[in-house]
Amino acid sequence: MQVFIMRHGDAVLDAASDSVRPLTPCGCDESRLMANWLKGQKVDIERVLVSPFLRAEQTLDVVGDCMNLPAQVDVLPELTPCGDVGLVSAYLQALANEEIGSVLVISHLPLVGYLVSELCPGETPPMFTTSAIANVTLDESGKGTFNWQMSPCNLKMAKAI
């Protein structure tokens, strides 16, 4: 199963609580850039898992405007910044056992980095800029292989060359 792990877009710092911080215009733009890039990779997302926090849900909305996503979206409290990475990993393994081919996960720091390490034992948690996406292949036994990571900055630099 292909797992695409995305950190939410850039969000405002000042809000009534962490859970209601909205995306900035830059966060929307960078999430759109990444979604269009992912679409260009011919990725077919079969399931979506998202944090209940506003900025993650807004990131999902932007991604959904750019590429075809399934109607079913699983909103998981385990995907909040201090969520349980073990539970998320177990959930992903259950999806793999259901023969789901690809999953998009939209979450937060530090969980996104820890999730890569949880799925790929021995892998150092990668740094995730806002809107960055990492790809992991999860095999039938539950062992993950870290394939790549892409960020808005990488795409902007490649375009400048």
Enumerate the language-model features and the residues they cover.
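Domain-level recognition of soluble alpha/beta enzyme cores
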Residues: C120-L155
